[in-house]
């Protein structure tokens, strides 16, 4: 670092010195030009001379230039070029006034070459500036960031020795690792594949939601393969200059050929691989030119032996079909959200360098985080570690992990916010309404936690978690989901006798579920098993702006009626449940007003009519028994959870943790009030 700082200082000092030299010569030029100011014509000079207005003259070395001064009040300086044939006669012979001071400039004793020094220095300075500009334009010796290197690839080359990520650092994706391990094995031992006549895939596309570990898998491939690894982002290809993207693609593959066998990884390839179209302006698109060059390099007339292209995207629907065909991206690997077992394995990876207390159960934690991807779980463990440090604890406990889950989902608590008692009451009944309706809806998930403490933009929340990972949502479950979401609004109507803006998000989610049931899932008895509306964008304008409508206005009217019927049915069912269990609604709301937060076990005890004191005594007895059986805790627990091999993980679809918000701070409503 010291050497870099010294170089920076020397570079800045050189720049300042050069600037001072330039300013010096600029000042000399200005002074020289000022000396030549006041130039007059020969006729004017002759007129002044005859009229006795000249006080002194000085004849320069060249014998033609005459400088002088007028005898006016301003002592005006002048300079004139007089023909040599008239110089002696006009000034010396016809001198009208003997008092005029005539002076000859003496010949210079300085060698002529000295007068050339300023010009030589100025030329050297200009040459120096040109050299510095060329060095900067060529990237200063590296980085390919210079003006003259626009066409050079910006891919970063990672050598095998610099790769520290391996497949041991990737968990919860056994099938995905298996697909990529085959690529690694081919790079290490290509002979057995070639003898069998097999062709290794030229390209592998990693597809999946954000945070599932696509880039991490690519890094692991680089670490395991032991070959050069070029990594670049899709956005690095396209610049403001025409032809730069295609040039960079060519340069990237030229570099890869020199380092073959190797791997090229393009992250976020949708930035350059978006489906081609006419575009809004109808003109030529620089991105399309880049894509065309990429298509040619992947499978054209050229031969790219030993080069494997790995790309990642979370938008496979917008990629060009020519890019996805066999021979280019032969294999697409779906990197989805892990199931409960996969989440447990991911958690084991992320707790290697963390100190956990004995009460931490990663299996329980994995079950309580459905829908969490690898990035979410890493963030969860980091939040728990920060909470433990904030509380001055030596280890991370289950309490910190539970709080971290809620923080990741709903945001941090805002206990300091002053809330009016009437608002607390509305929030308590709103959340209690959600919980009671979910409790008595057979297809709803169990309630995990209820709180009226503000978090994020919400004034309270009701969290319910699924008992297991599911791949599908039945019609009955979707209907009960709508009933649970409307429980808060119905509770307000029954208890308060008025409704508020707190259920705005609930209503939005209910409307979305009902509309998807009718238009996408074919769950409408009246309209039948038909999908309404196109699920893809218009190809002509680049697949993102316009959607086609393939149904009539009459059908649109029926769709709206069916959506309204589903929502009304859910509202009536929620109203019936709360009316039948009004005593339980009051009981849960009362405890919420006292404690502000109720766990799932406490909620079940309240609904079943059991006193909370018995539940607390039971929990204290369990904690005491644990404390008696706990052995001495070692500070360093690194390596306890290292073994994550040999686990078979089933790939399931993503399940999201549902939280029903209550009383989100409706800033839009406040702005409307101000406008009124």
Curated annotation (Swiss-Prot):
Places the protein is found: Cell membrane
EC number: 3.4.24.-
Cofactor remark: Binds 1 zinc ion per subunit.
Highest taxon above the source species: Bacteria
Protein name: ATP-dependent zinc metalloprotease FtsH
Requisite cofactors: Zn(2+)
TM spans (from-to): 10-30, 113-133
Disulfide bonds listed in the record: none
Cytoplasmic side: 1-9, 134-676
Record topology, Extracellular segments: 31-112
SUPFAM superfamilies attached to this UniProt entry: FtsH protease domain-like, P-loop containing nucleoside triphosphate hydrolases
Residues reported to bind Zn(2+): 430, 434, 506
Primary gene name: ftsH
